[in-house]
């Protein structure tokens, strides 16, 4: 179903596949290995774009750094008027989110909360978690994951 475009693959599943085969997530997605070893600069708006669904857009901020220990993304999520179902996800490690613009309803391990611009959260990402954009405008947040 994924190969036929009937089903989207989540970024966490891409990360699992990459780990299993010993490659970076970026190498799996873009068929290009990272090459920077000392530092990697990402200019504003120039992150490696990863778009798996129309609602979620990821920009990798560390994609060109060899053997990076953390994944850092700017994530933009479009609001879905009337949507109440939050798709839940798990992956090994921990995650930090900082809301840059807009607001999100975040579900983590049985609890739901609203985070607004400037709010942040650090959590165990092995617990089921997911989110929705709240309001009429997209939410943009910094997502930092590490195992």
Residue ranges and their predicted role:
Residues 61, 109-125:
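Short acidic-glycine-tyrosine-enriched beta hairpin
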Residues 4, 30, 110:
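Short, conserved catalytic or interaction motifs in soluble domains
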């Amino acid at each position: 179903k994924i190969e036929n475009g009937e089903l989207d693959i989540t970024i966490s599943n891409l990360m699992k596949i990459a780990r299993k085969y010993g490659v970076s997530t970026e190498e799996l997605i873009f068929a290009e290995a990272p090459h920077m070893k000392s530092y990697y600069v990402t200019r504003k708006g120039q992150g490696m774009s990863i778009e798996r669904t129309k609602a979620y857009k990821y920009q990798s901020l560390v994609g060109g750094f060899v053997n990076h220990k953390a994944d850092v993304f700017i994530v933009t999520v479009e609001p879905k008027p009337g949507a109440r179902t939050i798709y839940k996800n798990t992956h090994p490690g921990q995650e930090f989110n900082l809301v840059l613009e807009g607001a999100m309803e975040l579900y983590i391990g049985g609890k739901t909360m609203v985070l607004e611009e400037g709010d942040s959260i650090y959590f165990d990402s092995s617990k089921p978690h997911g989110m929705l954009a709240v309001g009429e405008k997209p939410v943009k947040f910094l997502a930092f994951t590490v195992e």
